Structures are given as C-alpha cells and as structure tokens.
C-alpha cells in the first residue's frame, strides 16, 4: 500500500500555532526535517522520539516534497 502523508500529518490551530505536526502529537514536521538535515540519522530520531515510526519519517519527506511541488512559490 502506498504511504500517504495525510495519514500521519495534520494542522490544528490550537497546536504549535497551526504548524504541521504528526497526528496525536505536538511534534512538528519542521523539527524532524531539521534534525534530518543536520545529519541526525533516522535511527537516532526514532530512538529519541519513540512515538514515531519509520512511516512518520517517510510521511515528513513526502509532505515536504508536496509543498515544494506546489504551483505557488513560497520564496520571498
């Protein structure tokens, strides 16, 4: 079955100022992507955040790709 980021990520106004978070948590997708970008391994992230699974990390990457692929530019 194809993984859908929508199954793992949500935005709620009352949680983390509406930033995308992993469902059922206050953990932002932004934070996890920053951790990956600074060189933290997936194994380290999963050990540090036991509520996450490898599928959550894949969902974060798919979410990021979806944003980049949008027709509207986010650059200022």
Language-model regions, residue ranges each:
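A short, structured beta-strand/loop element
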Residues: 3-43
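Long, charge-rich, low-complexity alpha-helical segments
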Residues: 28-76
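Intrinsically disordered, low-complexity and often Lys/Arg-enriched segments
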Residues: 1-5, 75-76
């Amino acid at each position: 079955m194809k993984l859908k980021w929508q199954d793992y990520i949500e935005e709620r106004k009352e949680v983390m100022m509406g930033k995308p978070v992993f469902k059922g948590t206050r953990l932002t997708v932004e934070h996890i992507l920053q951790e990956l970008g600074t060189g933290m391994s997936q194994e380290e992230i999963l050990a540090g955040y036991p509520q996450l699974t490898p599928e959550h990390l894949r969902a974060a990457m798919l979410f990021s790709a979806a944003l980049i692929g949008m027709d509207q530019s986010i650059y200022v």
